[in-house]
Amino acid sequence: ILDSAAKIAFNGVTVRDADLGDLTIDMALNHVDGETFNQLIQVYNESAKQQHDELTDEEVQITKKFIDTQPQFIFNPTLSNKAGKLASNLDISMASADFENAIGQGKIFSLFNHFIFKMDANKEALIEEAATVLQLDRLDKEQATKEATEQVNLGIKNGVQQGILVEDGKSVKLDLVLEKGELKLNGNVIPEEQVASMLFLLVMSMGQ
């Protein structure tokens, strides 16, 4: 069983000469069975050469075998600009690869040991990023900042009203945590049946 971690830093991320700030990414892949992981990489490398549109049976089986080893994946990106930071944290620990039974029985949460997604974004940093992107559309800085402020404030307002986001002073946050069989969004419990129904509708819409 292997644990691995990496940190990547990009100083001065630019798009068409526009400075979006500095990006750092902390990643980890823990509780990994080395042999199974090597098989997974080999199968997907071979499949990439064939350019299949859909997953092959071999890919499905090796993916399930890998997930059944209960790996943990951590992905924490942070973007910093002159106004502040935009940070998020994704931490997923798998428990089972029996997707068919889990979805069929409405036991979605049983697939995970835990699932954590958190976001903490400085509002001024959000506006700064949005304004920089809008300036790529040839808006001047003043107009871009005005539009960015309106868009960000409206997005935050709608997110707060829907219970997706929480305003905390100068920051906006999102906290989605699944632990011990209970899913909470910003502290509010989301029933497993509701999640199962949403996933079912999503799968049905993708099949059309």
Language-model segments: which ranges?
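Glycine-rich, small/hydroxylated-residue low-complexity segments
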Residues: 1-208
